[in-house]
């Protein structure tokens, strides 16, 4: 079986290699999805980057739980149980993959992925001088490219079919838990415990998204929850900025702005992430949008522009020095 399909998603093409069984599963918010995957480059050799079968353990994600590589939710929710399919994903969807791959590899090696620290080494890496600790991932981060994901869907579990603390709460308890989780996230953030703060924000988002599924989209109650969710996502992105996970910030803020183009904080945060990965024109465009929507932020915007210009000047000077040394 070899059926090519378009998922009506920009930059994604699907080819079914083995058809699954039964109807399309119900992928409600909070469902746990278990699958095997292989990630390959689009070169002639179809170079394998990661393979969960080689690791010996399948992957699981929770639907609606702010997974780093959001496009995987789109891919998985198009599949039936037992289905095997290949998905070609353009660069717009794969920019964060090196960060995800690093975390998965460190977990497989028995390391704590949250203990990683950024190293700096001049112009060794153009993206905020990161090294991910794996040469192939460093190259992939320097030069983002389309990737192919081969996925085999193994299991889909509803929220009440597996043990997860959040889902032991009823709707009223979930709503009561949100401000507590939000407040705890803020407290941890102020203490500099960004990983733990991000987890609290994620838990609150999952609670709200579950509640939101019970409301009619774009009506008053749904919009109230949406506003709360966006606030928490931006708090989560603030943690990501501190952790220097800039591509995930770009993905989440861009998603917010696609649906809510008037959120000033999302433009401001996206501008900062663009600046860190040397997308100077995009950063300037977002900062101009901040000024247009919120003139009172002029001082903060000018500060970010000065910082960006200074970093660009430093980068150009380092490049000149490097060229001089290469020429002797």
UniProtKB/Swiss-Prot annotation:
Domain PPIase FKBP-type: 53-145
Protein's GO biological process: apoptotic process; negative regulation of apoptotic process; phototransduction, visible light; regulation of opsin-mediated signaling pathway; retina homeostasis
Gene Ontology terms, MF aspect: farnesylated protein binding; peptidyl-prolyl cis-trans isomerase activity
Residue stretches of each TPR repeat: 178-211, 230-263, 264-297
GO CC terms, sorted: cytoplasm; cytosol; nuclear speck; nucleus; photoreceptor inner segment
Gene3D superfamilies membership: 3.10.50.40, Tetratricopeptide repeat domain
Primary location class: cytoplasm
Compartments where found: Cytoplasm; Nucleus
Highest taxon, organism lineage: Eukaryota
Job of this protein: May be important in protein trafficking and/or protein folding and stabilization.
Subunit structure as annotated in this protein's UniProt entry: Interacts with NUB1.
Name by which UniProt lists this protein: Aryl-hydrocarbon-interacting protein-like 1
Taxonomic source organism: Mus musculus
Lineage: Eukaryota, Metazoa, Chordata, Craniata, Vertebrata
